[in-house]
Amino acid sequence: MTASATSTEGQEAASTSGFWGLTLGSIGVVFGDIGTSPLYAFREAAHGAAHGEPVSRMIVLGVLSLILWSLFIVVTAKYVLLLLRADNNGEGGTLSLMALGQRALGRRSMFLMSLGVIGASMFIGDSMITPAISVLSAVEGLKLAAPALEHYVVPLTVFILVVLFAVQSKGTARVATAFGPVMVLWFASLAVMGIVHITDDPSVLAAINPYYAVQFLLSHGTIGLVTLGAVFLAVTGGEALYADLGHFGRKPIQSAWLFFVLPSLLINYFGQGALVLSDPAAIENSFYRMVPELLLLPLVVLATAATVIASQAVITGAYSLVSQAVQLGLLPRFEVRYTSESHAGQIYLPRVNRLLLIGVMLLVLLFRTSSNLASAYGIAVSTTMVADGIMGFVVIWKLWNLRAAVAAAIIVPFVIVDLSFFSANLLKLFEGAWVPLLFGAAMAVTIWTWRRGSAILVLKTRKIEVPLDDLIGSLEKRPPHIVKGTAVFLTSDPTSVPTALLHNLKHNKVLHEHNVILTIETAQTPRVDVSERVRMEKISEKFSKVRLRFGFMESPNVPRALAVARKLGWQFDIMSTSFFVSRRSLKPSSQSGMPSWQDHLFIALSRSANDATDYFQIPTGRVVEVGTQVTI
């Protein structure tokens, strides 16, 4: 055997092991939410269909058929086979899809921006419900194992969730390696439990025929629509497949879903159906009734571990989404802490963590059971799925270069299905669906206020700013005292004089040897190639313009990026460089163009924003802050 042949075989083996490693990782992270749905989805759907009456055979077959075809259409066809191909430089998710759509159109679209904001806001609302309903439904198994422990279900759930949120600041890199094996054990258990009961009554497999789904909806009227809202619980988490695209890649996610996760879920749902056909009373908790009493406690422990992993994935997703929103200018700069030196994506946002914890605690204490929480679950996810579908149309039409009619033929059937689920979930508005809508609306108002206030602030400051070329010309005619070193002035408008530069000249009456007007931009792509990171333009002997570009999923590190400028001829030395940053103190104005409440909200958001020094990772010892007062 030649050396080249040996090398090729080694590369193929490494590639294969890498693929299976990513597949295992995706099982542990991507499918946690949808993978824990069997705990409550079939039970809630059958309960809703029976409407207080005994569960009949036609109800069981109808519900199973609806679940099966919902998983086929919404998750498999729409997300796994279609939208996973709509990646933004390898990344997925609502905001990535929004940015991809903007890029496809070649301009900023307020419609796409609104869809992206709505989808992202509803994801945050869903991020509060998923941990609450998942962990609560798992711990409820204790009521069957030991009825005397029923009063401890809520306190134990609260304890588990508090611990989960408390350890976020420590990072999850160490324990994340166990997520894959635990979830593999979970899905394997789902399949085994289902097989045992399906063999008792194989006739339940008749529900594979879509006739039972259609017949159920046609014959049950409004109750059928209510049931559809409960059936949707089986597909919640499907949007996470797309959001985690950048972490694992399309093929590992597709393989894990098609060959392991989907079969395990379907087998378990059909097993629950077979159990209820033989024992209608089992519908009270059809999942835990699938195992003998001896295995009940181990199953509760495994289910709790699976729901904690599912919750962790959702929490991490919320951090990532908010971080992207900050980079895209949709939210103020939140404090971001990096919990792993080797994984840049391992981040922790203290404020987001606190808000999620408060929301989750309120949900658990107010609703107290997973059945009650099920009424609140679904509306946020269905809203996000509708938004994804519409934005997906733009990408298929403009980026994939298909005719509008062809793109519509592909995506409209999915949007119709999504709208059907959205309508069904709206029926639960007063039973609890208002909760995620309230959370999502609060998030959307926050984003809208920040965008609107920031735009007004830019317009007001531009009116009083001095053109940079005019100042340079004036300084050349009457030069001030020159001091050694480099001054870097951060600004959003490179054509105007940064406020910090004006204040430095006014109060200190000095100018540095080298002055850099630094602008930081966020691209519509997740990451920016190093070769495109820095653009430098020398505009006079003492002044240069530098533009730094970062992707919306990157952590902006200004000193590291400026080091790249050495290749462009700038001998950057951090120890001889001072960074001048403006800190604005905002005051409300009756002429701002916004309502008074929005003025005050924008000012509060601005005050809560993290320091530019920390956010851009500039050494504090090299920073000079200049305060200015602005009336908006």
UniProtKB/Swiss-Prot annotation:
Subcellular localization: Cell inner membrane
Coiled coil start-end: none
GO MF annotation: an example: symporter activity
Main location (coarse class): membrane
Membrane-topology annotation of the record: Multi-pass membrane protein
Entry GO CC: plasma membrane
Membrane-spanning intervals of the chain: 19-39, 58-78, 110-130, 147-167, 178-198, 216-236, 257-277, 290-310, 347-367, 377-397, 404-424, 429-449
Membrane keyword on record: yes
Keyword field: Cell inner membrane, Cell membrane, Ion transport, Membrane, Potassium, Potassium transport, Symport, Transmembrane, Transmembrane helix, Transport
Lipid metabolism found in the keyword field: no
Matching Pfam families: K_trans (PF02705), K_trans_C (PF22776)
Superkingdom field: Bacteria
Catalytic activity as recorded in UniProt: K(+)(in) + H(+)(in) = K(+)(out) + H(+)(out)
Record-linked InterPro entries: K+_transporter (IPR003855), K_trans_C (IPR053952), K_trans_N (IPR053951), Kup (IPR023051)
Disulfide partners: none
Function field: Transport of potassium into the cell. Likely operates as a K(+):H(+) symporter.
Family classification: Belongs to the HAK/KUP transporter (TC 2.A.72) family.
Protein name (record): Probable potassium transport system protein Kup 2
Organism of provenance: Bradyrhizobium sp. (strain BTAi1 / ATCC BAA-1182)
Originating gene: kup2
